[in-house]
């Protein structure tokens, strides 16, 4: 099949995610990828693109990583998948023990799903159900404005990015929203949170937030002090706290898990994306013993948490996740990332010379800036298309440009990316 036929048949049969398909006819080229290695994607003309967004924030250690490949192949020879109700297997037992070993001792029970949105759904249902078991009629959730937690109904309900939620408002769950903090500016948000809790605490099952970074919310970064104080207020008032670390977990925020920078422990920790290094779908909700014990009862009491997915606990995905943890353990990843993050941040300062580049910011291995003064113009799309010509895969959030690379990117490759970005931005000078 030649390249044009491949593109034509894709557009004939496939409806791509988060895409206005008409754009592929006018504004955005559809690029078939033939192979990938390390930080590079290769198209059918053997042109290479640096994966600046870790393929939607999932790839940590490069495409076709030799070690993860090896572990996946080994697992393929023994077990690919089994029903995870009434059965178990070695990869998931090992993974669960290792995850719990990395977390605060209070987070000790793992419930698996197969994507980030599903992890949020699990946590929401668990929090609601736990309150039901305790005899409390709490049917609302508290969340932040500008939040994004996924695109299933429950996850959308606790989100606040209008492009995703607006059309579905009539069918979403009832939620209470708090002004999102920004940077060190947290007092107004905290006060609003306290006021809502003071008047509604008997109705609120849980508070959901992405600690430190609202990723799909234009990479809004905010103080760990807000996370700490908000969590304390909620837990002191009998409100469960759900941390969505689907994007920021596994080293992305600068620590292995973002909550570790905040001095508090959530009641539910949702993890996905980087957990398998970008290989296979997997997510997990890690919760506390006291929550688990609420559901632990004789069958006839009907307290079971009856939630399941066909591919829950997939052995191949778990083998990849164990390989990812091996790499973290043996290669001192988080410490190396601190050095790399500092280098990237210093290099990014050259972009500050443009008057239309505002709010240069970073947290761990997430870097972003905003293009201002272009209201009504799709400058982010222009950056995307110009990036492709220079061999960069960028995927701006509107006019917010971000850089979220695999951890294996070299300093030389970083310089190429940022110098190329500078050349692209030169075109926007008036």
Kindly give the residue locations of the regions a language model identified.
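Conserved N-terminal phosphate-binding loop of PLP-dependent enzymes in the Aspartate aminotransferase
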Residues: 1-430
